[in-house]
UniProtKB/Swiss-Prot annotation:
Name of the protein in its database record: Glutamate--tRNA ligase 1
Main location: cytoplasm
Enzyme category, top tier: ligase
Originating organism: Rickettsia bellii (strain OSU 85-389)
GO terms, biological process: glutamyl-tRNA aminoacylation
SUPFAM superfamilies linked: An anticodon-binding domain of class I aminoacyl-tRNA synthetases, Nucleotidylyl transferase
Amino acid sequence: MTKVITRFAPSPTGMLHVGNIRAALLNWLYAKKHDGQFILRFDDTDLERSKQEYKDAIRADLKFLNLNWDQTFNQLSRLSRYDEIKKLLLDKKRLYACYETPEELELKRKFQLSKGLPPIYDRAALNLTEDQIQKYIEQGRKPHYRFLVNHEPITWHDMIKGEVKYEGKALSDPIVIRADGSMTYMLCSVIDDVDYEITHIIRGEDHVSNTAIQIQMFEALDKYPPTFGHLSLIINKDEKISKRVGGFEIATLREEVGLEAMAIASFFSLLGSSAQIIPHKKMDELVKHFEISSFSKSPTIYQPEDLERLNHKLLISLEFNEVKDRLKEIDAEYIDENFWLSVRPNLKKLFDAKDWWEICHKTPNIQDLNLDKEYLKQAAELLPEEEITTETWGIWTKKLAAITNRKGKELFLPLRLALTGKESGPEISKVLPLIKREEIVKRLT
């Protein structure tokens, strides 16, 4: 049986966003589900926009999400190989030279659109005479090269979309080699997939027409194409998510929003599938339950608040031994099990635990809250003398209610504000033992 090999091929022209990390996750999960390999490839042939800092950031995001790769390479290291294939396809008459300028091509495109026609290249370059070509060369024009798409039906069985069919005549011959000699994504990707024996490719449905053309490229190289799966796009309200939209970068979710890796991995590996989106603590659990056939063909709506809720669900499920190392990573190794269990139910982000530590160990500033000082003084006097435990709050407030005739918010809220500086948070009955008696009295008086 053929070994499953998948790949993730980002362009290092920006940060990873939730759309392409979803593709990375599903390719990784599919490979691991079938005891296969996962390859990281950098599509860096766009010399002007590709940057080393983006490569480093992409690696950091993948490592954060525990998406370890078995091999990695970048396309710039394979230029001589691409040149070999260029010569082969020229000999096979599947590549042809074109001499139009970008301005001329844009005029053609606008003319076609004005006539209600699809902007498909008219293959004028195939009819150039030797004299015309020589004239272009004398003008200093350098050729770009297009791949000749056969005008025949292109069909494949998609892992998600089912049977897909394209008419070759409805596709425009893509530019695969630019006038400066650099190669575009389309052909390089196919050459890499052949050489690295990629068996399965899972990517967004915005690549479907590319897939139709690339299947012909595989055939032109006398190779079988991989099995493809095209994911429905992630949309936020009315906008497709991409790196140009911004605001959905994995680095932002990690560093600024403060979400856990397994919350992000759980959410985006299940989003758009028929499976219930629940937090998983380990990648092995996601691998075990992963089924590519469960993904829908319909667009998937991404609501950031859903991801944040999942992060909360993950945190409240973590025992202290499961979160201890993460606390060290955020410089909160001073948090012990008792404190963790007390504040855990109210944590939206792990960093919130540090905030609650500060609240319990540093007197909050409540000068601007206009609290009833007489009531707080009375509360301090009625604080039980016994050791402060989780039972203290109930005993204390019951006594206060009897003496002051206060109840509900009027009874509890001033105490919470005085003790924590916040209107909401962990149960005060659990927080109270974390604050020293002297500190409780100090905050009340």
